[in-house]
Amino acid sequence: MNDLKIKFSNKISSSQIIEDPFDHLYIRDFFEDDFYNEIQENIPDIKSFDKILNTGTVSKNYSPERYIFSLQRDLDKIPKKQKDFWNQINNGFLSKEFWEATSSKFSETLKERFENLTKAEEEILGKTPKISCRTALIKDFTKYQLGAHTDSINKIFSFLFYLPSNNKIKDIGTSLYQ
């Protein structure tokens, strides 16, 4: 698992940008089968998750059936074996190599985005935006569904990985709208 930052970075670097409706990547089989099985084996028990509704990050109308496990804050809630596993994943996704692969892949998009900030965006982000990363597992027990929405102004990249334990729900996921 020590080479995750290289594997993850190579997946980004070797993928083609899809431009419609906006620049993005769609990568099938991002995780190799054996590693995917390890992920499944190491998903924390639901008791370790927090209701997103209780985090103060969403409105009171948000689904009470959605839970979050922060891979930065919540690792001490789980057994050492799982903690070590998720630390390795964090090290891959939060590595300099992964950031360089991603920012290089989207260099034109980033340049265009930050050269054309509106006044409102500048007020929120500042002249020189500060970049931070967060990783989390999200679990939904009813119907994972969010209506059409824009993302937060202060997000540069979002990486969404669907981790079903079987193929029953293989046709659901994220829809992109113009």
Labelled PLM ranges:
Residues 1, 5, 78-80, 125:
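Intrinsic structural disorder
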Residues 1-20:
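Fe(II)/2-oxoglutarate
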Residues 6, 37, 135:
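Aromatic-glycine hotspot motif
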Residues 7-11, 73-74, 123-125:
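Short, flexible segments with low predicted structural confidence
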Residues 14-109:
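Non-heme Fe(II)/2-oxoglutarate
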Residues 83-178:
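Catalytic core of non-heme Fe(II) oxygenases with the double-stranded beta-helix
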